[in-house]
């Protein structure tokens, strides 16, 4: 996308689109209350999958709920010399990238473009993964009377 978030650039709209650190979660971490997104997404911790509207590609939960591990290894200057489209991370490394933010993420970091990282052994209640199943595209119907 060309905007900060799939729904646009306004962090105040996050509560309608993603489960991030907002006014529902802030009471559990009073020290971080000033960082909370305005509004209520209805969940202080994880939310049921698919609770929020899909993005323009029809994919749910690309922001918030849990950080998602991605296959890239992290490198501080990883994108400095990479192509703009489909950049590839380093072939090896010490820490893996996670993206999208979680229920405990401030709006600044709840973006698909923001890269966070941890060692592959890291286990948190706010980190997960996305399972993907490839499916065949639907067959177009044959015109009446067409032979197989």
How would you describe each model-predicted region?
Residues 1-116, 120-125, 132, 147:
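Functional-site microenvironments in short loops/helix caps that host divalent-cation chemistry
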Residues 14, 140-141:
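Short catalytic/ligand-binding loop motif for oxyanion handling, primarily in non-cytosolic enzymes
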Residues 105, 138-139:
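Short, acidic Gly/Pro/Ser/Thr-rich loop/turn segments
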Residues 131-138:
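Short beta-strand-to-coil "C-cap" segments at the C-terminal boundary of structured domains/repeats
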Residues 143-145:
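Low-complexity, Gly/Ser/Thr/Pro-rich intrinsically disordered linker/tail segments
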């Amino acid at each position: 996308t060309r905007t900060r978030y799939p729904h646009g650039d306004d962090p105040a709209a996050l509560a309608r689109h993603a489960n991030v650190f907002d006014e529902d979660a802030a009471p559990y971490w009073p020290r971080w209350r000033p960082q909370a997104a305005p509004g209520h997404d209805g969940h202080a911790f994880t939310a049921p999958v698919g609770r929020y509207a899909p993005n323009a590609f029809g994919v749910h939960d690309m922001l918030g709920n849990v950080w998602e591990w991605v296959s890239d290894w992290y490198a501080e200057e990883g994108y400095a010399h990479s192509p703009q489209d489909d950049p590839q991370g380093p072939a090896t490394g010490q820490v893996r990238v996670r993206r999208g933010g979680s229920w405990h993420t401030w709006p600044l970091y709840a973006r698909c473009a923001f890269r966070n990282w941890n060692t592959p052994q890291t286990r948190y209640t706010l980190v997960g993964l996305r399972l993907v199943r490839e499916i065949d595209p639907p067959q177009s119907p044959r015109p009446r009377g067409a032979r197989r």
